[in-house]
């Protein structure tokens, strides 16, 4: 029996004994429910290949930008953590760096998740993690990862993973998704998600080449803006045919102002020629966001929006290590005015599901919850990126529930590249919901019977309903 605090059955539950008892009872309704992950960043190929994980660093450290950014902020070179395929250190040396700096994670959500992974996935007491024990734990993990029951497919069964959505380029052939769907020996559903960002952001390197190829490959012989729209429609349908239920959009901001056909064509031509201004690039992206919502009215894909992040804030790090290394920084923006064109035209359609995410907690109560509290199409996305941590998740409930109730919630989103953190993240969400609902019961605001119904809906029914799973 582990003596680690990470194994305590009351972790994250209320400190007040009476309220904690209620939370314990509520947790029993959901703790063992299957995991539904409608948005994340794992690769379907991992399950097709089903190969043993190479080593602890490759699995747990290098791909997890939540984890590596903490070390980088303390002066650790990302190359020494083998980020972006770099090999500044061996996997064992990178692990030693992590273990030697384990104290940096105290109080962070990342530290909590890693502790939960150690305790509940690998059976290793996380209190042992230190510079002195780094090699011993590395060797223990290496032995565990060599076992057949720790290959990707076996872990999916162990995690009780029912649905996992990936994030995919519109021109992806989705062969791995098709192979998994046709494999009777693999029960989890691995679904693609349409992510067109590479073709909407003119300011990103390679945009013109990618967009030209998209139109050539999927535009049905049409050119220009018409070819662009036709290509997007065709690829969306291809994704739907391969199991997709949603399209994700990592927009710069919330602007959804539509352009006329003529203006869209003009800016597209300038973008392909490399002469578009930044204002025109932003206008093009806003127009595509509106047009994707328009397409949703026909094909039924759920539309999720992740705005307000300055991607690749460190240009030097991007050049050296690539994208998605943890160098994304939030900036302030508003939702009410930006989303008005989209929601004014499509928000009254209850069959259109539009999920709004934010990294700015103040927006939840000021704009996102009021929008979701009026428009039948609008839903409040779960806390994301920097605010999918325990205290912010508790605040999220207080900031939104008074306006929207519980029915306008997306369901929990783990949004992770770290495979073994999935059960830890979902268990965290379940405990946070039990914590919040127990308080409402203790304050005699709802009955415990009603709370038990709500928590099951939040964990299981909400993501199925909102993401049309």
Curated annotation (Swiss-Prot):
Look up the record and give one Gene Ontology term from the biological process aspect.
D-glucuronate catabolic process
Q: Which InterPro entries match?
A: Metal_Hydrolase, Uronate_isomerase
| Coiled coil segments of this chain | none
Q: Which reaction does it catalyse?
A: D-glucuronate = D-fructuronate; aldehydo-D-galacturonate = keto-D-tagaturonate
This protein's UniProt keywords: Isomerase
Biological or metabolic pathway of the protein:
Carbohydrate metabolism; pentose and glucuronate interconversion
**What EC number(s) does its UniProt record assign?**
5.3.1.12
Signal peptide location: none
Q: What class of enzyme is it?
A: isomerase
Q: What Gene3D superfamilies has UniProt attached to this entry?
A: Metal-dependent hydrolases (3.20.20.140), uronate isomerase, domain 2, chain A (1.10.2020.10)
Q: Molecular function (GO) terms listed?
A: glucuronate isomerase activity
Q: Which family does it belong to?
A: Belongs to the metallo-dependent hydrolases superfamily. Uronate isomerase family.
PANTHER family (UniProt xref): URONATE ISOMERASE
- Tell me what this protein is called: Uronate isomerase
């Amino acid at each position: 029996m582990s003596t680690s605090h990470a194994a305590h059955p009351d972790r994250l539950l209320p400190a007040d004994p009476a309220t904690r008892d209620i939370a314990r009872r509520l947790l029993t309704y959901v703790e063992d429910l299957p995991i539904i992950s409608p948005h994340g960043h794992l690769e379907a190929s991992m399950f097709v290949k089903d190969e043993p994980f190479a080593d602890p660093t490759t699995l747990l450290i290098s791909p997890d930008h939540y984890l590596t950014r903490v070390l980088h902020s303390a002066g650790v070179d990302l190359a020494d953590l083998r980020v972006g395929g770099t090999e500044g250190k061996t996997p064992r040396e990178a692990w030693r760096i992590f273990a030697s700096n384990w104290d940096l994670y105290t109080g962070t959500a990342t530290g909590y998740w890693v502790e939960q992974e150690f305790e509940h996935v690998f059976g290793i007491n996380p209190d042992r993690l230190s510079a002195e024990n780094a090699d011993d734990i590395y060797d223990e993990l290496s032995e565990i990862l060599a076992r057949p029951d720790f290959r990707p497919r076996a872990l999916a069964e162990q995690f009780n993973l029912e649905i996992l959505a990936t994030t995919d380029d519109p021109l992806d052939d989705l062969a791995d998704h098709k192979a998994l769907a046709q494999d009777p020996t693999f029960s989890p559903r691995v679904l693609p998600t349409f992510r067109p960002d590479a073709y909407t952001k003119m300011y990103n390197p390679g945009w013109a080449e990618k967009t030209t190829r998209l139109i050539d490959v999927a535009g049905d012989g049409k050119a220009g803006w018409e070819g662009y729209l036709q290509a997007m429609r065709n690829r969306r349908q291809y994704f739907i045919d391969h199991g997709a239920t949603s399209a994700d959009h990592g927009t710069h901001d919330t602007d959804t102002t539509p352009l006329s056909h003529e203006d869209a064509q003009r800016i597209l031509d300038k973008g392909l020629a490399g002469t578009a201004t930044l204002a025109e690039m932003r206008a093009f992206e806003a127009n595509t966001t509106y047009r994707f919502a328009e397409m949703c009215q026909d094909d039924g894909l759920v539309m999720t929006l992740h705005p307000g992040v300055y991607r690749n804030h460190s240009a030097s790090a991007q050049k050296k290590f690539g994208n998605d290394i943890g160098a994304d920084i939030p900036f302030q923006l508003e939702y009410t005015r930006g989303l008005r064109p989209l929601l004014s035209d499509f928000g009254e359609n209850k069959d259109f599901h539009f999920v709004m995410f934010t990294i700015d907690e103040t927006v939840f109560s000021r704009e996102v919850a009021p929008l979701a509290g009026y428009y039948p199409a609008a839903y409040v996305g779960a806390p994301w990126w920097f605010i999918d941590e325990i205290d912010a998740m508790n605040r999220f409930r207080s900031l939104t529930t008074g306006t929207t109730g519980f029915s306008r919630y997306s369901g929990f989103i783990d949004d992770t590249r770290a495979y073994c953190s999935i059960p830890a993240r979902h268990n965290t969400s379940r405990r946070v919901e039990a914590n919040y609902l127990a308080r409402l019961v203790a304050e005699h605001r709802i009955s415990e019977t009603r709370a038990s119904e709500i928590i099951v809906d939040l964990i299981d029914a909400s993501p199925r309903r909102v993401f049309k799973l």
